Each structure stands twice: as structure tokens, then as C-alpha cells.
């Protein structure tokens, strides 16, 4: 095998590969053995017709397609390795010369993994943010628990007040026309919950059972349905019932009823601890995002379009899987949100580009710093995935994953380790 490389454009090369005549003839023989059972020739049992007879009857060309595929399978990867080329897509192959007893000459035009000029990544002037938990945040959580455990009582008389649950029928109109999804019957709306748009809920305060009212609101600009975004709307509302919440006392008995704690003080302390953990996770995410932004901005990389397309494809598949888990199809989701496939892919483009660039740059840093994934990390990650995908026998699933996807698992860990290395060096 002989290969020559020509750079066509950024991240695209053309390889001219020559396969020795003996090797191509061997590929022709393999192609004959693969296909000889397809031919019926008088005087010969099926599959026993000599190659010379088939060549004479049909021409050697009948074996070219399979022989070329066999020869390319054997020579293309060898050429990539010899020339240290890392493709990111399938090649476009063109045959230059072909014939029995001759060299097979073909070209393979392929998009390659981009070269990276790594920017600053050591000693970055980036600090992990810190978020304190306020007493107000703790009290808000306690109040939400109190509200969820309230006793609901029907109000036989009186009017709707803030915090009440109004049982309503409603029908919405935009430009004088009823719109899809804008109608409801016996809907329980908690006043002050912010469930409905604009100041819809506030306009119901003071109404009594049996009252009717035209409620005027404006849809948000980013409501999610193009035909409703930023549109003024009118809702015909009928009040059919009013319910009030009787809140439980916030004391030790309340804490015992809603949690595993014996006192309200212990409950609040636990809430504070959980909020602190949540804040720390948030701070870590923001710190990580700031580091990634910095290394992307200072590095130089020309991203091949095919890598971006593949990442968007992956993000779309991930979205589709999550929707299916919720009982929705992608088409239903697009109809509900007023999106098209093109709009969704365009929306994902920026995040996809950021992720691919970050992975490529971090991989380059890992190579420069000789960052590895330890056997312990590989086994732990495989077991985590095993618990997720094979809960009945996680160890067995972990072993399967290590055999089938070790490279992917290892790559993820190396990128995580590299990011950790960069974060630890921040000033």
C-alpha cells in the first residue's frame, strides 16, 4: 500500500492510495468466493463454478464492487494510520485505476479532526463564586411545605381573595377568535401562584360564585406559540366555586408530620443544608462554564461543519428520548411549542458548537498534560452506568459497557480530569 496526501482545504485532505496488484487480485478472489453461489451454469453445481468460467461468461467486472470494498477496507485505515490522519466522517471515494493484475488506485477525500492552537489554560484568573443561604430562602421553603400541607375548605359565600383557589370556566380569544388550548372547565386556579399569564389571577380577586368577567391580558413575547407571542387576549371567565386554604401551624408537630425530624428547628437546618448543597452545585457549574468560556476564547480552532452537524443530531436524539419518556413525540412537541425542525436545530447550534469546541480543546490539553483515566475511575463509571442501564445486574452491565464502550467512557473521564486540572490551577 502506498499513499499520498494532498490538503484540499482547512480540515479536508485527499489521499491517493495505491493497492498492490497482488492484493487487489486477492480481493477479487475473495469477491468471487462471496458471490459464486449466486450463479447457475449448466454442468456445474451451484457455488462450484470456477472463477475463470464466470470471468469468461460475465467479465471480471462483476466482482469489482465487492473487491473494491474489500481492498478499501484493508488499505484505507492502514493509510490513515501511516499518515497520522484522524477522520471525523466517512470518505468520498473515487476509483482512478482498476483492473485484474493491476494496481487499484483510488482517492479518498475526508474531513479531518481539526488542529488546535491551545490558548491559556494554566493559572486562569477565575474564582469559584460563593452563594450564602439567607433566612428568607429557608422560610420560603418552609412556607411552601406549609402551603402543600394545607387543608382545603369550600367557601359557601364571600369573594375570591389572594391565596384562594378559584374554580373557573374560561375561554380565550385573540383578535376576536377562539384559539386552541385557550379553554378550560372547572379549572382550579390558585390566586397568586403565577400559573396563568400576565395579571390574569389578580383580576379575579373580589369576584363571587356565579360572577362572570372579561379578563384582558397580553401573552409574553416568548410564550412559545408564534401565533400567541406578545398578543393581547381576552378571556371570558365564570366563577363556579371558591376554596380556601387552612394552613397548619408551623411548630414541632408540623415538622414531625411532614419530615423525619422531631423539631421545626431541625427541619429548617436540613432545608438550609440542602440549599447550601444546591448553591454549591450551582457555583461549581458556573465556575466550570467560566473556565470553558475562557479556554474557548483564547484557543484557535476551525470547527468542521460535519462535527457540528453530528453534535446537533445527537442533541436532537437526546431530546426525542426525553420526550418519549414523558409520553410525547417530537412532532407533538414541535406542534405544542410552535417550532419546526429547522428552528430547533438552529436554536441548538450555539450550544452544540460550544460543546464540540470545548471537548476538542480539553482533549488537546489532556494530550499536552498527559492526563489519563485510572482503572479505578473506569470501573466506578462503568458501575454507575450499569446501575442506570442494568439495575437487575449492574456488575454484569458494567462489564458489557467496558467491553463495548470503553473508549467513550475513558474519553469522558479524561475530559473531566482535564477540566479538574485547569480549575485547580485557577488563581
Curated annotation (Swiss-Prot):
Q: Which reaction does it catalyse?
A: [protein]-peptidylproline (omega=180) = [protein]-peptidylproline (omega=0)
Instruction: Set out the biological process GO terms recorded for this chain's protein.
Output: 'de novo' cotranslational protein folding; cell division; chaperone-mediated protein folding; protein transport; protein unfolding
Q: What class of enzyme is it?
A: isomerase
Where is this chain primarily localised?
A: cytoplasm
Molecular function GO terms recorded? peptidyl-prolyl cis-trans isomerase activity; protein folding chaperone; ribosome binding
Q: Which InterPro entries match?
A: PPIase_dom_sf, PPIase_FKBP_dom, Trig_fac, Trigger_fac_C, Trigger_fac_C_sf, Trigger_fac_ribosome-bd_bac, Trigger_fac_ribosome-bd_sf, Trigger_fact/SurA_dom_sf
Any one cellular component term from GO for this entry? cytoplasm
Q: Which domain of life is it from?
A: Bacteria
Q: SUPFAM superfamilies recorded for this chain?
A: FKBP-like (SSF54534), Triger factor/SurA peptide-binding domain-like (SSF109998), Trigger factor ribosome-binding domain (SSF102735)
NCBIfam families, per this entry? Answer: tig
| Family of the protein in this entry | Belongs to the FKBP-type PPIase family. Tig subfamily.
Q: What is known of its domains?
A: Consists of 3 domains; the N-terminus binds the ribosome, the middle domain has PPIase activity, while the C-terminus has intrinsic chaperone activity on its own.
* Reported function: Involved in protein export. Acts as a chaperone by maintaining the newly synthesized protein in an open conformation. Functions as a peptidyl-prolyl cis-trans isomerase.
- For this entry, the protein name equals Trigger factor
